[in-house]
């Protein structure tokens, strides 16, 4: 059973993710008391207990959270802070099998965001369609 900590669980994104994860019997969701949400020591303790931490924070706070986590658990970042960072895997499994494999084995996965995700998937679909049409005309 995997243990999950949502850093930023009181915000909209954190609430939505927590709601979905609570429905899963194969996961344990760690929670932090409201008065400890900004306490670095309390958060660091939860990072140590977690298998995976989901960062639902503003960019600067997400960067700081990575320092608190200090490589003790896998990180999924919902902010824009690490989207193009070379140490993070771009979390778009629908892209291709290589992307799925990279995400599955990564310690740090960035959220692609809704606008980039929509564009990339549309562009990839269009490119595949055009390639298929070209193949048929040869």
Model-derived segments and spans:
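Rossmann-fold NAD(P) dinucleotide-binding segment
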Residues: 61-77
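A short beta-strand-loop structural module common to alpha/beta enzyme folds
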Residues: 28-37
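N-terminal Rossmann NAD(P)H-binding glycine-rich loop of SDR-like oxidoreductase domains
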Residues: 10
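Extreme N-terminal starter segment of soluble prokaryotic enzymes
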Residues: 1-4
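Rossmann-fold NAD(P)-binding glycine/threonine-rich loop
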Residues: 79-104
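N-terminal Rossmann-fold NAD(P) dinucleotide-binding loop
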Residues: 14
């Amino acid at each position: 059973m995997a243990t999950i900590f949502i850093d930023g669980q009181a915000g909209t994104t954190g609430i939505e993710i927590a709601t979905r994860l609570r429905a899963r019997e194969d996961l344990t969701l760690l929670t932090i008391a409201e008065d400890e949400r900004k306490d670095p020591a309390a958060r660091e303790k939860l990072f140590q207990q977690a298998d995976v931490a989901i960062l639902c924070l503003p960019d600067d706070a997400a960067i700081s959270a990575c320092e608190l986590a200090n490589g003790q658990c896998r990180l999924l970042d919902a902010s824009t802070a690490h989207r193009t960072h070379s140490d993070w895997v771009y979390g778009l499994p629908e892209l291709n099998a290589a992307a799925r494999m990279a995400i599955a084995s990564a310690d740090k996965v960035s959220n692609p965001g809704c606008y980039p995700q929509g564009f990339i998937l549309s562009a990839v679909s269009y490119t595949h369609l055009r390639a298929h049409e070209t193949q048929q005309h040869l």
